[in-house]
Amino acid sequence: MILKETTINNYATALFNIAVKEKLVDDYIIQVDALIKSLADKDEFNKLVTYSNKEQKKQAILIIENTFSSFGFDIYLINALKILVENQLFINTRMILKVLYKKLLAYKNIVLGEVYSTEKLTKTQLNAIKKKISNKVNKKVELVNKIDPTLIGGIKVSVEDKVFDGSIKAKLEALKKQMNT
């Protein structure tokens, strides 16, 4: 069953409050990011933790416990995953974790963004862009590099509701617009 947005937010808020209270925010940022990535496109795993009888339910909960405790995930996160399995709501896990991740980053005054380029950027380039954008938005910025061959050249950065477009495509469009007026 897919949960409503408010219920997803409630789960995320509960986990966020635990992270703050237990002083685990930094750990949760790392662990939640890893969970989001590891559960991407894992329909087989969702099927493993779906059940139709008590024995399968016990197995599903054991799978969660064994899988995630072996990687050192926090017990509160594991228990939340087990609750989702028990209530047959595991399919909502990534949505809950994404909301939680945003709350954790906001708490640390960090924002997520994307930098679009025609080819993969080096770590040095990415760090230089992060620094420049961080200064513009007055927050620490974490960027994900996404490839967009339509840009022709240059980069486009999207952070919060702001877009910083230094691509050749944008410059050509601006020039075209200027010529039409």
Swiss-Prot record:
Membrane association type: Peripheral membrane protein
UniProt-listed PANTHER family: ATP SYNTHASE DELTA CHAIN
Originating species: Mycoplasma mycoides subsp. mycoides SC (strain CCUG 32753 / NCTC 10114 / PG1)
InterPro entries membership: ATP_synth_OSCP/delta_N_sf (IPR026015), ATPase_OSCP/dsu (IPR000711)
Name of this protein: ATP synthase subunit delta
Assembly behavior: F-type ATPases have 2 components, F(1) - the catalytic core - and F(0) - the membrane proton channel. F(1) has five subunits: alpha(3), beta(3), gamma(1), delta(1), epsilon(1). F(0) has three main subunits: a(1), b(2) and c(10-14). The alpha and beta chains form an alternating ring which encloses part of the gamma chain. F(1) is attached to F(0) by a central stalk formed by the gamma and epsilon chains, while a peripheral stalk is formed by the delta and b chains.
Compartment annotation: Cell membrane
Keywords: ATP synthesis, Cell membrane, CF(1), Hydrogen ion transport, Ion transport, Membrane, Transport
Cellular component aspect of the GO annotation: plasma membrane; proton-transporting ATP synthase complex
